[in-house]
């Protein structure tokens, strides 16, 4: 933040909500809640969540809160379901699912904070002969390029990255030309 302030140029934060700077962000909490609700509606009775470090406000804290909210609405609590924190990678997802399966509390559905984590989960399950979506449903978030390459195809939350990028550019131009408001905008 000090370096940004020292530069003295307009700044727009993209992808994270900021109280200090104008920003364009996605509703990560709402998206995670909706995806966990979909897993539950599809018949999952033993859901799990693989998140990321909660110091990351968007992918960590907000997605965790969304998953918790969906679980609470269905009468569950995060303390009652398998939960792991993983690195932002397929390897992180693989390791987290390996640990969940070793605990003996095998979920029938898992929401992953990112598509890369979900890719690792799918790899782990495939190696162990656990069918997706037959024996376990897997969902990710972000609709990254990897989501369309996986087999089976990944159920994922699609964020409108092009729209948010365009809005961030428009907001930055407005700030540079000193016109328009600098309020935060959700996408």
Predicted feature residues:
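Bacterial carbohydrate/catabolite-sensing allosteric modules
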Residues: 5-187
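Central regulatory/effector-binding core of bacterial HTH transcription factors
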Residues: 1-2
